[in-house]
Amino acid sequence: MANVADTKLYDILGVPPGASENELKKAYRKLAKEYHPDKNPNAGDKFKEISFAYEVLSNPEKRELYDRYGEQGLREGSGGGGGMDDIFSHIFGGGLFGFMGNQSRSRNGRRRGEDMMHPLKVSLEDLYNGKTTKLQLSKNVLCSACSGQGGKSGAVQKCSACRGRGVRIMIRQLAPGMVQQMQSVCSDCNGEGEVINEKDRCKKCEGKKVIKEVKILEVHVDKGMKHGQRITFTGEADQAPGVEPGDIVLLLQEKEHEVFQRDGNDLHMTYKIGLVEALCGFQFTFKHLDARQIVVKYPPGKVIEPGCVRVVRGEGMPQYRNPFEKGDLYIKFDVQFPENNWINPDKLSELEDLLPSRPEVPNVIGETEEVELQEFDSTRGSGGGQRREAYNDSSDEESSSHHGPGVQCAHQ
């Protein structure tokens, strides 16, 4: 005899735990024929047991779970649904879903309601300085007039059509010895499992058991919080009878800032300076996220290259829950060059004397051809006239393989 944790399902089919697949199928067909509702209307529950037992034992994975861990293995390994809760309750005692430990159940075993997610837009200043704000929400709460019963005491009756389950189980025969079990929401009680006569319904909630209520939440946005971070209000979501309320979850959405961009705890900004500032030093002031006026100085004689980045330590974002520690501020410099012909030609020689010497031009032996540099507008394409057309006569394959994006000046 095979060593298994539980034999109840084998006993239902009347086979030993070591039964083969053919033995299981043979036993199932014999019992299904004997207890089919069309032939034996009073044996509906027995037929469900037989179908369930065969469904588990004919599936190698489910059978292995059942053989090794018994009923508990099926409870923890099953996803539920399809009327499984009723069958488990009938065969083993206690529903399937009470053992699942998933999000639909709270720690105390009560069914748990859904969480309510709301976006909360915040500025970068809010995330830097912290902020307290009030948020108005509408949610369902239990009716105080009927204490969430929907009517006066004793008026609520179990739905006779679905026996209080909220769903109806239907069995459809697919072929001789093969059936399909289906469930649908009970139309008599709209899936609630209960019915209330219209004359006995609560006047305040009209039998719905809940009413709408406006809730004001005080929201604390702490310093250093980030885009996508969540603020949770436990148990503040919609209420329902016999259900533990879910949570209200606020999802922070950072609005774009006109000066700063955030990267973790660091801040980035771009600042434009002129050529004279890049060569001779500069000083500028900007307003930080906490309204402080920050003065940035750069000494004469130290050159700022176009596109280079300098850092100011400790002027980034505060760390979440450790606001006295801050990230850094990175400033990228956009050096603005003067317009064409900005200086009198007579002064150019004086300027050249002040700048570093030109590199020596090597002597070229042989014939040379002088060309002219022209302005290039990248938005209008490369042009090129006939020379470009001739160049494009090469095959598409060669073109796609070797013609990458044009080389651009590198800025560091």
Curated annotation (Swiss-Prot):
PROSITE patterns: DNAJ_1, DNAJ_2, ZF_CR
Positions of modified residues (N6-acetyllysine): 39, 152
Residue numbers of Phosphoserine PTMs: 78, 123, 394-395
Binding site for Zn(2+) 1: 143, 146, 202, 205
Topology of this chain in the membrane: Lipid-anchor
Repeat (CXXCXGXG motif) residue spans along the chain: 143-150, 159-166, 186-193, 202-209
Pfam families: DnaJ, DnaJ_C, DnaJ_CXXCXGXG
Cross-link (Glycyl lysine isopeptide (Lys-Gly) (interchain with G-Cter in SUMO2)), chain numbering: 134
Oxidoreductase recorded as keyword: no
Domain J: 8-70
Function: Co-chaperone of Hsc70. Stimulates ATP hydrolysis and the folding of unfolded proteins mediated by HSPA1A/B (in vitro).
Protein's recorded name: DnaJ homolog subfamily A member 2
